[in-house]
Design a protein with these regions (language model features):
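Metallo-beta-lactamase
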Residues: 42, 49-50, 113, 141-146, ...
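N-terminal amphipathic/basic-hydrophobic helices that include classical n-h-c signal peptides
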Residues: 1-18
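Active-site HxH/HxHxD metal-binding segment of metal-dependent hydrolases
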Residues: 50-55, 59-138, 221-229
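Short Pro/Gly-enriched beta-strand edge/turn motifs at strand-loop
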Residues: 14-20, 114-117, 139-140
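Conserved beta-strand hairpin/beta-sheet module of binuclear metal-dependent hydrolase folds
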Residues: 14-65, 156-168
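Short Gly/Pro-enriched turn/cap motifs at secondary-structure boundaries
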Residues: 24-26, 125-127, 146-148
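Conserved Rossmann-like nucleotide-binding pocket used by diverse enzymes
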Residues: 22, 73, 143
Length: 236
C-alpha cells in the first residue's frame, strides 16, 4: 500500500491573521519545520530534513505561494533541526541563517550526529548569531526569547499580533525538551519556560519542534514537567 505524503498544517492568510504559519513534519525525527509567511515574505524555522526527507515539500509551498525567503531561523543546533539548512542555502544562496551564540559550540558535533541514525553527516554551514529582543525579517516581525536548557542557546520566536510562539524543543504538548544531552540543564529549562513562555498570554498558540500544537494556558495548567516536582522526560 502506498503511503500518502504528510500534509502541512496551515493557518490561512486573512486580515486578522496577517502572518500565518505552515508546519511541515520533515526529516528523520519528524521535526516540525515552520514557515511563517505574509503575502510576499517567508521565514523558515528549523528545516530538519533534506530534499528527500521532506524539504522539497517546503520548497514547493514557498514556490506555490511565490514567497521571498528572508531568513532561516534555528531554535537550536541539534542535527534534526538543521539537516536541511545547506540544501536550502543552495536554493536561496543570499538568505541569512540565524542561531543563538550559545549554541555555536554544538555545531561541529551536530554536523556528525546523523551518522548515529545511519544518515549522511549534516552538510556544513555557518550561521550568524541573533540577539534576544524584537526582530524583523522583511515584513515578518516578532521577538526572540532565549529559552535555554534543552541546549545552552535554545531560543523561541514570539509573534504577539498572531498570538503564536515557536518554541523548538523547549516546550511541547504536555512535555518539555530532554536535558540529558550535552549542554542540557533542567533547572535552566524550567526557569526559561516559566519566565519566558508562561508569561505570554494564555491564548498564545505554541508551535513546538515535534508533535502537535498546544496553548500556553493549557500547558501552565496541565504540563506535568513544569511543576514543583520536576522530572526529566526521555521521550525527546
Amino acid at each position: 500500500m502506498k503511503l500518502l505524503p504528510k500534509l502541512p498544517t496551515l493557518q490561512h492568510l486573512t486580515k486578522d491573521n496577517p502572518m500565518p504559519i505552515a508546519t511541515f513534519p520533515i526529516g528523520p525525527l519528524d521535526t516540525n519545520c515552520h514557515v511563517v509567511y505574509t503575502e510576499r515574505d517567508a521565514l523558515v524555522v528549523d528545516p530538519g530534513g533534506d530534499i528527500d526527507g521532506g524539504l522539497q515539500d517546503v520548497l514547493d509551498f514557498i514556490a506555490r505561494k511565490e514567497l521571498s525567503v528572508k531568513a532561516v531561523l534555528l531554535t537550536h543546533l541539534h542535527f534534526d533541526h538543521i539537516y536541511g539548512v545547506a540544501p536550502l542555502k543552495e536554493r536561496f544562496p543570499s538568505v541569512p541563517v540565524f542561531a543563538s551564540a550559545g549554541d555555536l559550540p554544538l555545531l561541529s558535533t551536530s554536523l556528525a550526529s546523523g551518522e548515529k541514525w545511519g544518515l549522511p553527516p549534516v552538510r556544513p554551514f555557518t550561521p550568524a548569531t541573533i540577539a534576544e529582543g524584537p526582530c524583523m525579517f522583511g515584513s515578518i516581525h516578532g521577538e526572540i526569547r532565549f529559552t535555554p536548557g534543552h541546549t545552552p542557546g535554545g531560543l523561541s520566536f514570539w509573534m504577539p499580533q498572531e498570538h503564536a510562539v515557536i518554541t523548538g524543543d523547549s516546550l511541547f504538548y504536555r512535555s518539555i525538551g530532554r536535558t540529558d544531552l550535552p549542554g542540557g540543564h533542567l533547572p535552566a529549562l524550567t526557569e526559561a519556560i516559566i519566565s519566558k513562555l508562561f508569561t505570554l498570554p494564555d491564548d498564545t498558540d505554541v508551535y513546538p519542534g515535534h508533535g502537535p500544537n498546544t496553548r500556553i494556558g493549557d500547558e501552565k495548567r496541565l504540563n506535568p514537567f513544569v511543576r514543583p516536582a520536576k522530572k526529566d522526560p526521555a521521550s525527546r
